[in-house]
């Protein structure tokens, strides 16, 4: 009887500490970010990651400056280098300050009459750590529209992703997230930062 009880306890103990077959392996599998599409992307994107002004122009904008940054990963959680990242959003007045790509859209959501230097769009390329960042401004918020930005990531080896970034307090982070050019961002500036790690479908490497 004692031998039976001892064997039962051993099997019960092993069962407690055994890994479940359904336990998610977070070491080599990341949850793919879902697509959320937006109809208001610009006809022409600005070729800089600073949405506050065009290249070579002085900045003159009305609103709070923010930093949007994070990492791009493939579905095996490997950082994706040399991915093209496109960002577009409204300004503090709630309108897109550019000409839209699509013609059948609500034209009331766009404006070309503004003395602000805010461009509303930009492009970044991820570094070898998969990191990206944009200098932007806090967009307009109302009962109908939450503060958000739209983003699209393209890479020749991965499925293109387009989604929406929720610029709420839950996604705020410190300045330790990613590498930022110290020339553009002074260390003493208390700029609100929002971090987003995005996962694309596919793999960039054949072997790990």
From Swiss-Prot:
Belongs to the intradiol ring-cleavage dioxygenase family. The keyword Oxidoreductase applies. GO terms for molecular function: ferric iron binding; oxidoreductase activity, acting on single donors with incorporation of molecular oxygen, incorporation of two atoms of oxygen. The keyword Oxidoreductase applies. It comes from the Bacteria. Transmembrane segments: none annotated. Its EC number is 1.13.11.-. Disulfide bonds: none annotated. Coiled coil: none annotated. This is Putative dioxygenase RF_0617. Keywords: Dioxygenase, Oxidoreductase. InterPro entries: Intradiol_dOase_C, Intradiol_dOase_core, Intradiol_RC_Dioxygenase.
